[in-house]
């Protein structure tokens, strides 16, 4: 396994908060980044769920463990099914080959199991949604 999906999600969201609070400039940079992401993920011609499925494919292609964990969580929050997520993942495998497949069958699989399990409590979900500005 390439990492604990829950820990990766907590570390990323905590890291963004810590980065933003270090200096005024970093606060502005973090806010600008998060605004750009928020705007790009708003419902438009493509809905939020579809955009999260695209993001999973991109994250797998680039082999970013933090991105894979984050977008697996967000896709589930948007109502994506495991089957939809795995099909989006397989599109990335068509372009990324073995490395994308490796992350699909390990980290993505673990993330889906983790975020749908009892070990990922309601409190965990609330903390992450608040940190992401989705609460």
What are these regions (language model features)?
Residues 65-91:
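Mid-chain, well-packed structural core segment of small domains
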Residues 90-107:
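Short Fe-S-cluster ligation motifs
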Residues 31-35, 48, 52, 56, ...:
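N-terminal, well-ordered alpha-helical segments
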Residues 47-48, 65, 82, 102:
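Alpha-helix N-cap/helix-initiation sites
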Residues 18, 49-59, 88-94:
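Alpha-helical scaffold segments that form or flank carboxylate-/histidine-based iron centers
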Residues 1-50, 103-135:
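Acidic, glycine/proline-rich low-complexity segments that act as flexible tails and inter-domain linkers
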Residues 54, 58-70:
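Short, thiol/selenol-centered motifs that function as redox-active sites or metal-ligating centers
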């Amino acid at each position: 396994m390439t990492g604990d999906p829950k820990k990766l999600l907590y570390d990323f969201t905590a890291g963004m908060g810590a980065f933003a609070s270090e200096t005024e400039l970093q606060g502005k940079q973090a806010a600008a980044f998060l605004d750009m992401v928020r705007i790009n993920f708003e419902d438009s011609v493509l809905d939020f769920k579809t955009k999260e499925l695209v993001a999973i494919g991109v994250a797998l292609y680039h082999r970013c463990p933090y991105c894979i964990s984050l977008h697996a969580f967000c896709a589930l929050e948007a109502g994506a099914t495991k089957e939809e997520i795995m099909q989006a993942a397989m599109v990335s495998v068509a372009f990324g080959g073995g490395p994308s497949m490796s992350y699909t069958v390990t980290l993505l699989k673990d993330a889906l199991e983790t975020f749908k399990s009892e070990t990922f409590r309601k409190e965990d979900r609330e903390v992450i949604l608040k940190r992401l500005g989705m609460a």
